[in-house]
């Protein structure tokens, strides 16, 4: 059988299932692939439950995570869908951003209603910037009483509102993943309804190329007779020859310069785009004026900061993390983009210590400024060894 070519004609959106253990996240993922396979067999292979449940391990920012990737298409879109087998895997995935989500399907069992992990996942979604949620009220075939279904729906809406999601407007679709997976036509139709809601309520993400230019500096060279070249991978946006850029971070002051050349694989280009590994020739900049860890950006789009709040996951001993807890005034290195900066940790009110395997909020003060914005991810390291991962939730100073 010939391999299907990936069609770039449809918009691509990344989504995932979140919610409490045993509420049916993986069953729902399998059922979506089945129902879409039945509706559009030429577009969609069916991915069985056990294939998703045996999720392969991946590494993101030094942390091992089990994560299953499934793809499927609706009439309108191409989706990449992530599902994690274990609760800890969800937390690690959401904090490290191993698999970015443009939106999530929150799975809540109609027989249980929202449970502790439901709340934890919604809180994490809020903190790590999963912008949109659609609710699948699963196991609805097990509840005969309409009033109970309405109560559970109300509870879920209130929970979402309490974490600043638009609880009143979020689509809540009653489904039975198991029945749909077993081939029940009516419940299959409910899953198509769920996917129509996902199509309509999770907007297309802004592509990296449309965002303002940013490139983390990995290396600095001098080219005799031409000047200083910085190299790195363009994270977002486009940089053109003769454009003005700023060099931000590490040093107290921001420097402005002009890009006089863009090179890739020793060829001169007119521009560098998101995803390209390029060298940028900078006008009037000395080798010692720039260093790894700074970023080159479109002027006035990002600022340097030293104090921030973050949500972090601390590796346990088996994951190669610490063997002992840490306390306030812990001073590890924070690895942002391409470099380590030492920082001092303040723990939230009432938290005495953080154990390996915990996830927590914290405030950090860095000894050098970093070009920073909410949503920026980092690793926590001790002597080059990753002991945690996190994401900036609020810039303070």
Swiss-Prot record:
Region (G4): 138-141
Subcellular compartments: Cytoplasm
Record field: catalytic activity: GTP + H2O = GDP + phosphate + H(+)
Provenance organism: Frankia alni (strain DSM 45986 / CECT 9034 / ACN14a)
PROSITE patterns: G_TR_1 (PS00301), G_TR_2 (PS51722)
Taxonomic placement: Bacteria, Bacillati, Actinomycetota, Actinomycetes, Frankiales
Keywords, comma-separated and alphabetical: Cytoplasm, Elongation factor, GTP-binding, Hydrolase, Magnesium, Metal-binding, Nucleotide-binding, Protein biosynthesis
Family stated for the protein in its record: Belongs to the TRAFAC class translation factor GTPase superfamily. Classic translation factor GTPase family. EF-Tu/EF-1A subfamily.
Pfam families xref list: GTP_EFTU (PF00009), GTP_EFTU_D2 (PF03144), GTP_EFTU_D3 (PF03143)
Domain tr-type G: 10-206
Summary of subunit composition and partner proteins: Monomer.
Residue ranges, annotated region (G3): 83-86
SUPFAM superfamilies xref list: EF-Tu/eEF-1alpha/eIF2-gamma C-terminal domain, P-loop containing nucleoside triphosphate hydrolases, Translation proteins
Binding-site residues, GTP: 19-26, 83-87, 138-141
PANTHER family tied to this protein: ELONGATION FACTOR TU, MITOCHONDRIAL (PTHR43721:SF22), ELONGATION FACTOR TU-RELATED (PTHR43721)
Chief subcellular location: cytoplasm
Protein name per UniProt: Elongation factor Tu
HAMAP family (alphabetical): EF_Tu_B
Residue span of region G5: 176-178
């Amino acid at each position: 059988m010939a391999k299907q070519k990936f069609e770039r004609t449809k918009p691509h959106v990344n989504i995932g299932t979140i919610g409490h253990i045993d509420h049916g996240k993986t069953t729902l993922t399998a059922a979506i692939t089945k129902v879409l396979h039945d509706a559009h067999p030429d577009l969609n292979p069916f991915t069985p439950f056990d294939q998703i449940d045996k999720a392969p391990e991946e590494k993101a920012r030094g942390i091992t995570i089990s994560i299953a990737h499934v793809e499927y298409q609706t009439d309108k879109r191409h989706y990449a869908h992530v599902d994690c087998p274990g609760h800890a895997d969800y937390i690690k995935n959401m904090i490290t951003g191993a698999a970015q989500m443009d939106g999530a399907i929150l799975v809540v069992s109609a027989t249980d209603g929202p449970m502790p992990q439901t709340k934890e996942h919604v809180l994490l979604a809020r903190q790590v910037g999963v912008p949109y949620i659609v609710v699948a009220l699963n196991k609805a075939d097990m509840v005969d009483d309409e009033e109970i279904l309405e109560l559970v729906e109300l509870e879920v809406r209130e929970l979402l509102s309490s974490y600043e999601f638009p609880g009143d407007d979020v689509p809540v679709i009653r489904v039975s993943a198991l029945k749909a997976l077993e081939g029940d036509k009516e419940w299959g139709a409910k899953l198509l309804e769920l996917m129509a809601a996902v199509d309509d309520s999770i907007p297309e993400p802004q592509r990296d190329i449309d965002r303002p230019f940013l490139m983390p500096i990995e290396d600095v060279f001098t080219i005799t007779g031409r000047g200083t070249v910085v190299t790195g991978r363009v994270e977002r946006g486009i940089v053109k020859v003769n454009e003005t850029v700023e060099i931000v971070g590490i040093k107290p002051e921001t420097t402005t310069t002009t890009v006089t050349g863009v090179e890739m694989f020793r060829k001169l280009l007119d521009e560098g785009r998101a995803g390209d590994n390029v060298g940028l020739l900078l006008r009037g900049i000395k080798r010692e004026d720039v260093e790894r860890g700074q970023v080159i950006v479109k002027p006035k789009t990002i600022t340097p900061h030293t104090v921030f709040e973050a949500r972090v996951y601390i590796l346990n001993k088996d994951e190669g993390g610490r063997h002992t807890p840490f306390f306030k005034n812990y001073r590890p290195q924070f690895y942002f983009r391409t470099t380590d900066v030492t920082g001092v940790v303040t723990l939230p009110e009432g938290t005495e210590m953080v154990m390996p395997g915990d996830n927590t909020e914290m405030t950090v003060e860095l000894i050098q400024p970093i070009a920073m914005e909410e949503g920026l991810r980092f690793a926590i390291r001790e002597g080059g060894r990753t002991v945690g991962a996190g994401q900036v939730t609020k810039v303070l100073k």
